[in-house]
Amino acid sequence: MTGTQALRHHDNFLQVAKSYYQLTKPRIIPLLLITTAAAMEIASKGQVSPLLLFLTLLGGTLAAAAAQTLNCIYDRDIDHTMLRTRARPIPSGRVQPLHALIFALVLASLSLALFVFFVNTLSGFLAMTGIAFYMLIYTHLLKRHSIQNIVIGGAAGSIPPLVGWAAVTGDLGWIPWILFAIIFLWTPPHFWALALMIKDDYAEVDIPMMPVVKGEEATSEQIWLYTLIVVPFTFLLIYPLAACGVVYGVAALVLGFVFLKKAWRLKQNPFDRDIARSLFKYSILYMMLLCTAMVIDSLPMTSHLIATIASLFSCS
């Protein structure tokens, strides 16, 4: 898009930049970054280099932005149909698909270069794998054709902790794969709660989301089952892996209890969109606080504090 063409839909170049920024769906990215950071802190036992953390999160941001931009290009037809998404940069005509593609390729190239030259090759490979899986498997093969679209496609959003772990250690082990699995199992309750809220939008464009195909009752049942699996699964980081300790354990217990309570409430009231909205919002908070607890638990000062408190009780 030339400057003249861009300004047909914008008053100034700041608005052009804003349109390209909106292509990246920036509200999605912070959650991906906090899962990356949590893996890095656990891998380094709370002593990750600030520079390495910054470079890895920057590379992850660029990769996620590239993936979301490519998604906007691919889904421009359904985005144009749905009232909720009609004002996005491509369907509204503010950004041309070809220029969005160039933008996405530049972002992906910068991400790969940053990882390979300043972090390591494995983390770069994993980041690019995430983009490829998101576009080829989820967006192209599954989203419009399978009721299991976000179940299988959720693997793309589960890759960030693998990237974070690889950035610190240069390899992968059981712990990062458990982190991957936690996010993978968390994704269906999170996304199906959203799908319950906007079921009509998906139905309008023939996207076979669970609520559209199976209905609200079946969806709420599946949400409950996945929540029932993911909450106890989070405790594998404590036993047998011993990757996290008391602080994380308490947080996982409390956060998990609330998650289960909200999922059960939705199961009892599957047609209540306010309850679905409450669960959707909480699922985001759940993952962010769970990862924050991982970070706090991994810090050396946390271990020292717990040891000090334990010694005081033992002396008394």
From Swiss-Prot:
It comes from the Bacteria. Gene3D superfamilies: UbiA prenyltransferase (1.10.357.140). It catalyses: heme b + (2E,6E)-farnesyl diphosphate + H2O = Fe(II)-heme o + diphosphate. Pathway: Porphyrin-containing compound metabolism; heme O biosynthesis; heme O from protoheme: step 1/1. The keyword Transmembrane helix applies. It holds the Pfam family UbiA. One of its GO terms (molecular function) is protoheme IX farnesyltransferase activity. Its main location: membrane. The chain crosses the membrane at residues 28-48, 50-70, 99-119, 122-142, 150-170, 178-198, 223-243, 244-264, 293-313. One of its GO terms (cellular component) is plasma membrane. HAMAP family: CyoE_CtaB. Converts heme B (protoheme IX) to heme O by substitution of the vinyl group on carbon 2 of heme B porphyrin ring with a hydroxyethyl farnesyl side group. Carbon 2 of the heme B porphyrin ring is defined according to the Fischer nomenclature. Belongs to the UbiA prenyltransferase family. Protoheme IX farnesyltransferase subfamily. This is Protoheme IX farnesyltransferase. It comes from Microcystis aeruginosa (strain NIES-843 / IAM M-2473).
